[in-house]
């Protein structure tokens, strides 16, 4: 058997997220149904994914891995999948990778982009299912200052839906916004981190837009970010505006080390140790 990397794109509007669910249409469910069929395999082909996107969230740069026979004809596989999959999901490429590659745990970072229209924008009905409206005008200088204040290793519990046994400690690597020079004046908020917990990106954007529109202050955001439990005052933005754009990985020789590091559960001691090292 050989490990294969799949690069995948999908429009999440008509999917109940990535992960397989009973009686629900999901991206994982579609792919795990059709991959063994087009390869004429009599055993299941479970996929491991970089980011388990929620219902309605899109992806241009999703990555998964799967173990398949050594002699897979990737050209034929892609051609057959394009015939049987619906147009809202595409497997863009398939290539062999080292056995140490893990789409989830080997990832160094995930980059999401959230697209918004504010009162300065000119909405386009054709793309409305991929952009979320927000009330008022967004001051991007305020938004970028607020985003910068959240960078680094910290507990993002205030921005995450609770999951029993799951850590909410993450390293936020980049968080900035820009207004595109497009006919709509779309605002793009880029958020990149080593990993994300449930609803974290949409909650971060909800908090940042509250500050950028003047409805909330920077002090409010600072107090929210310091909380170790879910903040009810933070709006979770609609899924339609969010797209997983890219996943970054180390060189092949560092894959196993990165996977082992990612599997280790982080605690508040890690945050304290980092603060001490920065002095």
UniProtKB/Swiss-Prot annotation:
Binding locations of substrate: 112
Entry keyword annotation includes tRNA processing: yes
Listed CDD domains: PseudoU_synth_EcTruA (cd02570)
A Pfam entry, by short name: PseudoU_synth_1
SUPFAM superfamilies: Pseudouridine synthase
Catalytic residue positions: 54 (nucleophile)
Keywords: Isomerase, tRNA processing
Enzyme Commission numbers on file: 5.4.99.12
InterPro entries, A to Z: PsdUridine_synth_cat_dom_sf, PsdUridine_synth_TruA, PsdUridine_synth_TruA_a/b_dom, PsdUridine_synth_TruA_C, TruA/RsuA/RluB/E/F_N
UniProt GO molecular function: RNA binding; tRNA pseudouridine(38-40) synthase activity
Any one of the GO BP annotations: tRNA pseudouridine synthesis
Catalytic activity field: uridine(38/39/40) in tRNA = pseudouridine(38/39/40) in tRNA
Entry function: Formation of pseudouridine at positions 38, 39 and 40 in the anticodon stem and loop of transfer RNAs.
Complex and partners: Homodimer.
Family per record: Belongs to the tRNA pseudouridine synthase TruA family.
Protein name: tRNA pseudouridine synthase A
Species: Cutibacterium acnes (strain DSM 16379 / KPA171202) (Propionibacterium acnes)
Annotated gene: truA
């Amino acid at each position: 058997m050989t490990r294969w990397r799949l690069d995948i794109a999908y429009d999440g509007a008509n999917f109940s997220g990535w992960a397989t669910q009973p009686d629900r249409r999901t991206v994982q469910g579609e792919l795990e149904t059709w991959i063994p069929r087009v390869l004429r395999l009599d055993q299941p082909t479970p996929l491991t994914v970089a980011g388990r996107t929620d219902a309605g969230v899109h992806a241009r740069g999703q990555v998964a891995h799967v173990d398949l026979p050594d002699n897979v004809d990737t050209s034929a596989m892609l051609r057959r999948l394009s015939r049987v999959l619906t147009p809202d999901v595409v497997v863009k490429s398939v290539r062999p990778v080292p056995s140490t590659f893990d789409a989830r745990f080997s990832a160094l970072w995930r980059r999401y982009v959230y697209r918004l229209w504010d009162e300065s924008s000119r909405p386009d009905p054709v793309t409305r299912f991929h952009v979320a409206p927000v009330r008022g005008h967004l001051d991007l200088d305020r938004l970028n200052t607020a985003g910068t204040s959240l960078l680094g290793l910290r507990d993002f519990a205030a921005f995450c839906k609770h999951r029993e046994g799951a850590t909410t400690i993450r390293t936020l690597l980049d968080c900035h916004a820009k207004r595109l020079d497009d006919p709509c004046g779309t605002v793009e908020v880029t958020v990149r981190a080593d990993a994300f917990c449930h609803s974290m990106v949409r909650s971060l954007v909800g908090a940042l837009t509250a500050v950028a529109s003047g409805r909330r202050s920077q002090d409010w955001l600072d107090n929210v970010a310091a909380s170790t439990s879910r903040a009810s005052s933070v709006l979770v933005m609609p899924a339609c505006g969010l797209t997983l754009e890219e996943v970054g990985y180390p060189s092949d020789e560092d894959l196993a080390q990165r996977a082992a590091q990612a599997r280790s559960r982080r605690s508040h001691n890690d945050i304290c140790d980092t603060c001490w090292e920065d002095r």
